[in-house]
Structures are given as C-alpha cells and as structure tokens.
C-alpha cells in the first residue's frame, strides 16, 4: 500500500468496509486491531495531499475527523439501525440510524462530502479543500 500511495494524486479516497476513525462503539472497526489502525493513520498522515476515508457496514451514518483525516460512514439505504444514538470523540455532529447514503461532489479545488437520507435531506456535510 505504501508504494501505491507514493503515486501522484490530487485527492485520495480510501475505501474500507469497516470504520477507521471511530473508536467507541462495540462493533467491528479498525480500532479493534490497534497496531494496524495506528500504522494506517500514520501512513495517511504522512501524505502531503488531502484525503478522505469512506466506510460502511454500520447501518448508520456519520462523519468523523481526526486531525486532518476525515471519514464518512454511510449505510444502509435499505436497512437502518434500531440503535437511536451513538457517540464518539471523533464524531462531527451525530450519527444517523435512518436509511442513508453518502455523496461526494468533486469541484476544481474541493470535495463536498454529504450524508443524505432516503428522502434526499442532507443530514451532515463537510467541505474539504485541496
């Protein structure tokens, strides 16, 4: 992976099936394998350009931030969660248990990251400049 990340890019989107930044819930996450999580975060932090982590498989959505790393988790569009609230020190805003999806809109020098419900209402958003 390190060799791949040495290639030139304007903006990096890293996709993972489980959350990287979330630490406080009891479900599967990179924090359950702390050495690998630390290695991945350190590797991403070394990159000079902006990056975004996208993840899913939580049956809820949210946006997380650690230093200059941002992660959007979205899922699911057809089967939300019955758990109504969840917190995390790295969470921006709150998590959403209703059906949702993530949308990335790339512009000349920025990416708009949105978490949207099934009725197309924006639940959370953040803009990342690069």
Please provide the spans of the model-predicted regions.
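Long, structured stretches of catalytic cores involved in phosphate-ester chemistry, encompassing
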Residues: 1-130
């Amino acid at each position: 992976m390190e060799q791949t990340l040495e290639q030139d890019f304007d903006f990096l989107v890293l996709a993972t099936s489980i959350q990287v930044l979330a630490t406080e819930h009891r479900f599967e996450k990179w924090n359950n394998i702390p050495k690998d999580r630390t290695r991945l975060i350190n590797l991403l932090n070394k990159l000079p350009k902006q990056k975004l982590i996208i993840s899913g498989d939580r049956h809820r959505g949210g946006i997380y931030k650690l230093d200059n790393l941002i992660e959007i988790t979205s899922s699911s569009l057809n089967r939300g969660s019955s758990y109504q609230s969840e917190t995390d020190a790295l969470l921006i805003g709150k998590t959403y248990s209703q059906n949702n999806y993530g949308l990335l809109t790339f512009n000349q020098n920025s990416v708009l990251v949105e978490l949207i419900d099934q009725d197309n209402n924006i639940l959370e958003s953040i803009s990342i400049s690069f």
